[in-house]
DNA sequence: AAAATTATTTAGTTTTGTCTAAATAATTTT
DNA sequence: AAAATTATTTAGACAAAACTAAATAATTTT
């Protein structure tokens, strides 16, 4: 597998993420995601097409090729292993890891990453609950549902938090919700879409729709 | 302290290393050290001068300013901490650490490095025996002498190996010489400048001038 | 179906870091 | 002290990655 520049890697990773949702990715979406200009996206897309990492016809959207997908998984593996390292070994808080991992992910020594993986004990998920691809690019694909769509009375476990800001971390810490927390929705209120939830045998409490939207759970 | 590009950092580090030896650094020396062309060096020197990291008059040599020296120590700190991490935690061998650290050193989060330092237990020297600057840029300055200049009969401890190749590591492992080994020169042979040395109470053995040149020791 | 709006691409610049070839300065040899 | 050699700088080009402004294509509104 060839080596790509940090810039190319950031584009590849963004396309991978966006195409999970929409199937195909547009110029404007990418420009917005990467905080760059549409014209810059077009330039880079031509380059990545030439390198056979993606397919696209002018004015249609982009899609990674099989090879492009493999490259993306490699970058995501590096990113999430570093995040795990920062949180677990260096005691970074949850909201601090992403920014640093955004740089570390571009150091591409295969040996470094495989040894790091081993040192960390082959973790399956990063500090936000996102799965870490293994050395062959395989990763866990457990069915996760948004907390807002969990039916009342169904026990579930928090598996993933999307938003990685300091603000959401503060709130989650206050509410004592972390990845792995087992909870149940008691009631859904139509007016403001807030949820009443219960953790274990503790008294139930309320969380806002905005918060619930960012929490994914798995059925148990 | 501002942020510098990987390229600028590699130049700064190289100047720092070379000026330790010669006091001042020339265009050709730098070009050779960095495997680049003299014209590229001149370009970069203008840039670093503009940023007040070095002093130079055309056709004289270069010297880092005080600020330039501080920046250099920061890069060296990152480089050596990563080398220590790779060797100690990830079990890289001695000859493999430098190349990877050459990339990792350019990830410049201060918090990352200070936490890494703490995680590693504030190590004083990297795997080759070179001192690691602390968070304030201070580092050990123990007097080291080349093994070829150690007088016969004076006990000393191996503190440092300059050459970092796989080849020298193989030889040192075979001879059971590592950093920290206590030894004594028994005899120096004029003909080929080979040395007879003894480790502890074991039988004495011979090492070549080429090998001895790359080993530094400290008196005990 | 035209017109208006929105999305995307193209054209032309800019910055950073590199290179080759040519010019000039400094040093060494004769 | 010239001449020859070596070191350094300058001039001009190039590639990567970004940007702005203008052109064009696609979509939506009227
Ligand atoms: Mn992340
Ligand atoms: Mn990144
Ligand atoms: Mn090194
Ligand atoms: Mn480097």
What are the functions of these language-model segments?
Chain A
Residues 1-12:
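Short alpha-helical segments that sit at the start of domains
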Residues 60-79:
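Basic, amphipathic "hinge/linker" alpha-helix immediately C-terminal to the N-terminal HTH DNA-binding motif
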Residues 21-31:
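Short acidic, hydrophobic short linear motifs in intrinsically disordered regions
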């Amino acid at each position: 597998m060839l080596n790509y520049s940090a810039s190319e890697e950031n584009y590849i990773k963004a396309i991978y993420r966006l195409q999970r949702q929409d199937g195909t990715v547009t110029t404007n979406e990418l420009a917005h995601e990467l905080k760059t200009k549409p014209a810059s996206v077009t330039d880079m897309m031509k380059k990545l097409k030439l390198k056979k990492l993606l397919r696209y016809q002018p004015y249609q959207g982009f899609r990674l090729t099989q090879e492009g997908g493999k490259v993306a998984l490699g970058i995501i593996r590096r990113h999430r292993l570093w995040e795990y390292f920062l949180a677990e070994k260096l005691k970074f808080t949850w909201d601090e890891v992403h920014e640093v991992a955004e740089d570390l992910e571009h150091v591409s020594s295969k040996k470094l990453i495989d040894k790091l993986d081993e040192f960390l004990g082959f973790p399956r998920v990063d500090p936000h609950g996102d799965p870490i691809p293994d050395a062959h690019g395989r990763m866990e694909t457990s069915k996760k549902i948004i907390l807002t769509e969990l039916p009342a009375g169904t026990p579930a476990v928090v598996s993933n938090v999307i938003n990685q800001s300091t603000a959401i971390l503060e709130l989650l810490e206050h509410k004592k919700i972390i990845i792995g927390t087992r909870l149940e929705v008691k009631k859904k209120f139509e007016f403001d879409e807030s949820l009443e939830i219960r953790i274990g045998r503790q008294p139930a409490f309320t969380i806002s729709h905005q918060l619930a939207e960012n929490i994914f759970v798995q059925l148990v």
